[in-house]
């Protein structure tokens, strides 16, 4: 097919049909892009914790669905209203939130949560419809967070797309479209920590490692990493961690006490919660300083979050963040450039690579202690 011929494409995608740990590669139809949309041929995608939650019906149990909101691809065709902005062959990152620059939130520069192009949970694009269907039955397929990157082709509104330098190492671009950037942004944009700050990062997956790197580049003096996987100690140190705590080594001691042991009994200025385990939050808050300690909730959890009012009455702050406070057009290009300049090295994130036809293997790979990031290679 010609790169600039907008027609229905039949391709393969990873489809989730029901609750549970099951995914199948099926033939689907991908419609042409509408006026303000882009159809993308995916080159790489990666697995994020939030993608795995959709197997459990979080945040909404919509099926059939194609997961995936991390990835990088090449523009295959564009809608009639955006031919001057993007063209076939451009390398782009599909994103799960946009930045209009004009709404109250965007103008305030206090948040990255755009009113015009928000994070969407409906499983549909901005006009309330889908661009994907099962090839044999025409059954509508739901998108995942405006994206669905676990497909050979996908359609997305241009306001959720970022054109990038084709010289960028493309697997890195996939990692930066959510996980690592979300962590990196939390100390950089969401809290804007100052030089000499003391921080603790709970959960050293891609998000947590990003938080460590962001804290290091902001000048944090002590960066404590907490994880029950001993393999993460080396990973954390590679990104700038100064101390490591494995709670399994101290079964009779509270994590908050172990953090205070490292910080002269005071706790840390900032805690970054990157586990997505709701039951841990109360203890994480307790690891921050009385009076002005701040905990940033990053990891998405399907359960209600239990917290102690006394912890907050004692002057602590709990704050949530999406994408680490990073604005998709104003801030994300800065992170991409830092990677191209080798200020940020992401080799330590890459642990496993699979083909789309082997997508079912992810459930076992994710259980491996050396797993950090799984890359789907469409080439």
Curated annotation (Swiss-Prot):
InterPro entries given in the database record: ADH-like_C, ADH-like_N, ADH_Zn_CS, GroES-like_sf, NAD(P)-bd_dom_sf
Q: Could you say which residues bind Zn(2+) 2 here? A: 100, 103, 106, 114
Gene3D superfamilies tied to this protein? Medium-chain alcohol dehydrogenases, catalytic domain, NAD(P)-binding Rossmann-like Domain
Q: Which GO terms describe its biological process?
A: formaldehyde catabolic process; isoprenoid biosynthetic process
Q: How is the cofactor bound?
A: Binds 2 Zn(2+) ions per subunit.
GO CC annotation, single: cytosol
Q: Broadest EC class?
A: oxidoreductase
Tissues with expression: Expressed in flowers and disk florets.
Q: Which cofactor does it need?
A: Zn(2+)
Q: Where does NAD(+) bind?
A: 49-53, 203-208, 227, 232, 275-277, 298-300, 321-323
The UniProt catalytic activity note for this protein reads: (R,R)-chrysanthemol + NAD(+) = (1R,3R)-chrysanthemal + NADH + H(+); nerol + NAD(+) = neral + NADH + H(+); (S)-(-)-citronellol + NAD(+) = (S)-(-)-citronellal + NADH + H(+); perillyl alcohol + NAD(+) = perillyl aldehyde + NADH + H(+)
- Which residues are noted in the entry as Zn(2+) 1-binding? 48, 69, 178
Family matches, as PROSITE patterns: ADH_ZINC (PS00059)
What GO molecular-function term can you cite, just one? Answer: perillyl-alcohol dehydrogenase (NAD+) activity
Q: Which family does it belong to?
A: Belongs to the zinc-containing alcohol dehydrogenase family. Class-IV subfamily.
Official protein name in the record: Alcohol dehydrogenase 2
Origin species = Tanacetum cinerariifolium (Dalmatian daisy)
Gene coding for it:
ADH2
